[in-house]
């Protein structure tokens, strides 16, 4: 009988966890890897945001008189293209709305970041070249 109590007590102590353990991770709820159980932020937060490119009617008419294709870039990475007649919108579209070029980007360190976006023609002539601050967890419209 003493052996059963001893084994039972041993099992209880073995199953207890160390509640004093410090958990490192990301404490920012805007980050994709946010962990509410984290005690100390270790700088590992990963942020993500969607971006949609669109032309207003004036830009579509102007570019249509200049080129047959426009290419979209974010930080020198090709995102997509549109061919004449260009898709345009009178108001900012939603990210990933059909007919518009969208992309998702990731970054580290803070909940907003600066990106460089460009719009070129098929011969790599640059029509737009801008820097823009974007926020994590949102749909950012450019152009």
Language model segments and positions:
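Short, surface-exposed binding/anchoring microloops in extracellular/periplasmic proteins
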Residues: 48-77
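Structured interaction patches on ligand/partner-binding surfaces of diverse proteins
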Residues: 114-143
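Generic short beta-strand segments
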Residues: 55-58, 85-86, 120
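Tryptophan-paired
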Residues: 73-109
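Functionally engaged cysteine thiol sites
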Residues: 26, 45, 88-100, 135-140
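Bacterial Sec-dependent N-terminal signal peptides
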Residues: 3, 12-52
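Generic short beta-strand
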Residues: 24, 70-71, 117
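Solvent-exposed strand-loop boundary residues in beta-sheet-rich modules
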Residues: 30, 76-80, 123
């Amino acid at each position: 009988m003493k052996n059963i109590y001893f084994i039972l007590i041993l099992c209880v102590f073995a199953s207890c966890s160390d509640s004093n353990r410090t958990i490192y991770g990301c404490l920012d709820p805007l980050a994709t890897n946010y962990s509410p159980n984290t005690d100390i932020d270790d700088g590992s937060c990963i942020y993500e945001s969607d971006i949609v490119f669109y032309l207003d009617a004036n830009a579509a008419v102007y570019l249509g008189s200049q080129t047959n294709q426009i290419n979209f870039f974010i930080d020198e990475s090709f995102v997509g293209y549109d061919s004449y007649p260009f898709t345009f919108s009178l108001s900012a579209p939603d990210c990933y709305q059909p007919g518009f070029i969208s992309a998702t980007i990731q970054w580290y360190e803070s909940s907003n970041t600066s990106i460089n976006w460009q719009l070129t023609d098929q011969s790599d002539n640059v029509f737009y070249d801008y820097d823009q601050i974007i926020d994590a967890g949102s749909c950012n419209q450019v152009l």
